[in-house]
Amino acid sequence: MQRIESVFAPSAEERASYIIEGVLEIPEGVTQIGEDSFSDCSEFYSVVFPSTLVSVGARAFARCQALEGVEFNDGLEEIGEDAFAGCTALEEIELPASVTFIGRSAFQCCRSLLCARLGCAAKHIRPFTFSYCTALQEIILPDTLEYIGCAAFCGCSALKEVAFPESLKAFDWVENESDGNTIHGVFEDCSSLRSIYIPEGVEKICDDIFKGCSALREVSIPSSVKTIGQMAFAGCSSLACVELHEGLETILGGAFGDCPSLCHIDIPESVKEVDPGAFFDSGIPGSPKSEDF
């Protein structure tokens, strides 16, 4: 094991210049790992954090392509934006209860990640946090979770089921980004996703949220949901059973479009608006075709 006795790299202009092989052990006493500190280092396969560490900065370990495991310490509070993005060999993460902040895209494109256990106190999973983790099969969400950002799990094509905690209040809708990037639904193109449980308390099923989840077979929308967003379940080609409840008011365009296995649906009396294209190219008799729009 190789111990680094002193590391200070607060920004991209002062990046760590060490060549580190094997196991990187951050020494006791270190409280922060600065932005970009170890980004693009490809020589070490494991990282051990000290008990004193509080914060991992933005992009601190981004694109460390040999990194297979990280030992997160109790006492860690913050994981910055893109902190482990592109760590393509990382296989598993388990976050301690002390973590309250997980930055945007923190684990994006960790393509070998199989399991993420978030036993932390975070209330938000921010946009793109686990997007394109194509090997991810298991995700355990924190009991404190209230909000899941857009594209948080987009493209996690091996993910088969998700159980949301009762604390969940909202999924993020499609955001307007100033940089012009295309924003995707929270679970868009999770092509292996078969089972979901949406808890009472969620008021909106946001745009594109389960778009392209071609293995999803059934879904129950709780009575707290007022709106099903545009293209929310579009392209869910195996979806055959949808249970809607009183309380639902609006079904927007393409919400169940291109769902050929969906042949019947009961619309509650509480529904005030159904977009004419809500069920385009579905199996429901008389539903419009995409070429009609």
Describe the function of each predicted region.
Residues 1-9, 17-32, 42-55, 65-78, ...:
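Structural signature of tandem-repeat unit edges
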Residues 14-18, 186-187:
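Short, conserved catalytic or adaptor-binding loops enriched in Gly and charged residues
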Residues 34-37, 57-60, 80-83, 103-106, ...:
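Consensus positions within tandem repeat domains that build extended binding/scaffold surfaces
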